[in-house]
Amino acid sequence: MKTFLNKIILIIIFIFPSSIWGKDVLLQSTTSTKNSGFYSYILPIFKNETGINVKVVAVGTGQAIRNAENCDADILIVHAKSDEEAFVENGHGIKRHNLMYNDFVILGPSEDPAEISNSQSAEEALNSIFKFGYSFISRGDNSGTHKKEKNLWENAQIEISDYSGKWYKETGSGMGTTLNITAELNAYTLSDRATWITFKNKKDLKILYEGDKNLFNQYGAILVNPERCPYTNLKESKIFLNWLLSKNGQETIQKYKVNGIQLFYPNAN
């Protein structure tokens, strides 16, 4: 009888997600937030206050959204607003909330051979890279950063796919790998500021262009819709979301710094 019951328990564990057995929350999020140390900072604070453990899967925004659409998530934190809104409109998420922001920066070799540092806009900077034909390294992974980069090329009226494999090279990888390749090739790239600040292998790279309003980088948070994903851990993930949006959570986000530099700025709604 005991053996039979053990088999039944194993079958149930196999069929149903682990989140319904405990307090773990499965968070699909970006490499930029995890690699910056953000979650290593805030999640222990949240767990200490609530007893709830949050497990993070860090991938590009596009992949994170696909994973959540496949019910492999309880909550989503990414940075591609139009895709986030579509996620909710298509019934996969309950509601999108602004959570925090920072910005993107254009990096390149310190001597700046494409002369982008005096540009008046991000699009002008990209046009200079295009004009000189200097190497630009793209993530090429459908991440939030990649989506922003493609949007900037479009605004600059450059059909970037025409130059793929020439001076425009795609890594198909995360920001860390892309930065390493950019540093090795002494090329240009677009990065979120948080990853750049925490990146160790800077070599001769530096920020050459920043501050354009089009480089704004908004992060959103969305609970997965239990009507689409009935086994989602809605109870604990809602506690986590409410904490992130609360005064306490927002102050915790604001306090996270690396080498005295604030990486994310809370702006919950």
Predicted regions mapped to residue ranges:
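Exported/periplasmic ABC-transporter solute-binding proteins
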Residues: 22-53, 62, 66-67, 72, ...
